[in-house]
Amino acid sequence: MSRGLGDVYKRQPAFFAIVYVGVMLSYVYQTRMLDGGKFHVWLIFLCSWGCDTCAYCVGVLFGKHKMAPVLSPKKSVEGAVGGVVGAILLGIIYAAATKGGMVEYAIICGVGALISMVGDLAASAIKRNQGIKDYGKLIPGHGGILDRFDSVIFTAPIIYFLSVLLIH
């Protein structure tokens, strides 16, 4: 008995859940298990949430040019630049506070910020494709847990590999 494309489409959510959430988030744990991982693991959240917060603030104040009007109409180019610069500065401050390498942390946070924006836009594309605004309703005004962690999910593997390459 052959299986049609319908079977493939029925299995996509399970595959998505395993790879997108399970495998990629496992890099948070893997980063924590590196030498010095108790400091490096925070870079994941510093990059993604720091970039998001700085991008929002700069975008609200100075945003004029839409970055991805179809996927995420409120995001601006100015906000994106502010997010990356903000994440780099947060990385430098974190390096000073933890006696880490400033250049290494700045590079990690800059690249991590870019990837976190890609993750956020990818999540927006998935939601638009499925015709939904948020992944859930757990956090009023913010959607579900996955909405808060979409950029973290993309950032975690990159921070892990950059930590291995630049710090270890």
State where each predicted segment sits.
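Interfacial transmembrane-helix boundary/kink motif in multi-pass membrane proteins
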Residues: 10-16
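Single conserved hydrophobic/aromatic residue that forms the stacking wall/gate
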Residues: 1-9
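Hydrophobic alpha-helical transmembrane segments
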Residues: 16-54, 59-65, 69, 77-168
